[in-house]
Every structure is written in structure tokens, then in C-alpha cells.
């Protein structure tokens, strides 16, 4: 299968929203293949600094190759859920001018059969963004209970045939454990009685299993909670999400920070006592028609920006 080149989504828009001070310190929480990082560095002065983070060793190798000679750049092999610890180690808590999170899976991860993310081509059933840690998709699918599998497919994939698919997975693994993506895709496909037009019948299930294996929503909740402390006053949080589960989390978090602490109705509190920490900057942004035409994977992208008070 031909690999699509990785095209960074909402590149200019994200960096424009992020970089408010060329001499500031910034964090790219999802380095990927370095599209956002490269443009951030172009916007920074010699005093500016960029710390990039990624779970994927392939991304780490790319970062070290691309920016080896740039003294403003550093890369950490970790999850962005470790944001505050990584910032604390470098004395950056409360001093960062901007944090960028470009969520989801990069094109090389999706297109490389050996990574095990794709139902379109057969490969080892892995799906881990960080292949040095945690159980693979095969280990999870072969050991999880029927109820757990059904819950994950329903909650993370919004799959209406979750119970039916979970039952089929359990029945099949008793005959032959899952080790390949093609095997799992065929079982899910057979258990899906109503295919959505233009969408592979295993799409939602594979998304759900990937989210489960990589703890994507837990990590997102963790990094959002830490971002407020890591940012300097006036610092910005820019998040690009690719499905409704992520976007709902981000939208709810920003709204909560804008509203501050919940208080009983009628209690005489001044505005400053509500502990509001952030304000939303503008409305959610989507990729333009031109960008979607050039990069079909950008069609579901939603970008939200908030600023620390």
C-alpha cells in the first residue's frame, strides 16, 4: 500500500495562535514528524526555546536528526501526560508561553503495516504509539473480558454493535488467538450487520482499541489538568483534536477553567474569588476546504485555543 506523506494539519493557524513571544519557551507535546516544531522554531528568536515530547521512538529519531544542531530545541521520549514532571525537571513550571497538542495518530503510524494500527493492510496487532511500554492490542484483545471489550468499543468507538462484536471476538480467540490486524478486522467485519457507506466496518472498533491501548483519553485529561500550572500568565494552550471524544474533553476543560469554581447560587462572591484560570480565544477552528482537499485526514480536525489568566 502506498504511504501518504505526513501532512501537518492546521499548521500555520496553530503556530500563529501559539507563539505570542519569540523569546519565550514553548512545548510541542506531540512532535510526530516535526511539522509544527519546525514552524515554531522559525518563529522563535535565538533566546526562544522549544521542548518537544513524543511517545514514538521513530518520532524521537526524526527529531534528533532534524534538529540536532539547533540549541533552542530539546526532545523527550515520554507521554505528554508527564508534562508537569518534564517541565519541573527543567525549571519551567509557570514559565511556559505556549503548549501545543496535536492529538491522534500520524500518517506514518497509520500507513506502516508493522505498527499494527491499520485494518486496511495486514500487520502485527500492536497499535502502541510507544512500543517500549504497555500491553499491545493483541495482548489486550486476547485477555480482556467480553464486557470490557464491549464497553471499550461502545465508549471509545461509539460502535452500536459493540456487544455483538465483543461476543464474536471472544468466540474467535478461543479457537485462534489474535496476532494480526487482518484477522481482527475480518472478525469485526463479519459481526457488523450494517456498514456505513464509505467507511470500513472495522473503523470504529479499531479506533476504540487504539484509544484503549494508548490510554489516549486518560492522558489527555492528565495533560489538560497540568497545563494550567505549567503555563505562564498569558501563555496559550492550543489543542487539535480529531474525533468528538477528544474535542468534548477539551471543550469541557476550557469551559470549566473559564467558569471557575462552582459556588452555591446567590453566594456573594467577587469575580476574582471564583478562581477562573483561563479564557477561550475565539471559536473552534476547522481545516479549510482547500486543506481538506489537499489532505483528507484534516477533515475531522478541530482546533481550540485558550489563554491562561
UniProtKB/Swiss-Prot annotation:
Q: Which InterPro entries match?
A: RsmH (IPR002903), SAM-dep_MeTrfase_MraW_recog (IPR023397), SAM-dependent_MTases_sf (IPR029063)
User: Carries keyword rRNA processing?
Assistant: yes
**Catalytic reaction list:** cytidine(1402) in 16S rRNA + S-adenosyl-L-methionine = N(4)-methylcytidine(1402) in 16S rRNA + S-adenosyl-L-homocysteine + H(+)
A Gene Ontology cellular component where this protein is annotated is: cytoplasm
Ligand binding (S-adenosyl-L-methionine): 34-36, 54, 80, 102, 109
What is the superkingdom listed in this entry's lineage?
Bacteria
Cysteine-cysteine disulfides: none
GO aspect biological process, one term = rRNA base methylation
**EC no.?**
2.1.1.199
Q: Where in the cell is it found?
A: Cytoplasm
Main location, first listed in the record: cytoplasm
State the Gene Ontology terms under molecular function: rRNA (cytosine-N4-)-methyltransferase activity
Gene3D superfamilies attached here? Putative methyltransferase TM0872, insert domain, Vaccinia Virus protein VP39
Entries under Pfam families matching the protein = Methyltransf_5
**Which keywords annotate this record?**
Cytoplasm, Methyltransferase, rRNA processing, S-adenosyl-L-methionine, Transferase
Q: What does this protein do?
A: Specifically methylates the N4 position of cytidine in position 1402 (C1402) of 16S rRNA.
NCBIfam families the UniProt entry points to: 16S rRNA (cytosine(1402)-N(4))-methyltransferase RsmH (TIGR00006)
Task: Tell me the protein family, please.
Answer: Belongs to the methyltransferase superfamily. RsmH family.
HAMAP family per record = 16SrRNA_methyltr_H
Please state what the protein is called.
Ribosomal RNA small subunit methyltransferase H
Species: Cellvibrio japonicus (strain Ueda107) (Pseudomonas fluorescens subsp. cellulosa)
Q: What is the lineage of its organism?
A: Bacteria, Pseudomonadati, Pseudomonadota, Gammaproteobacteria, Cellvibrionales
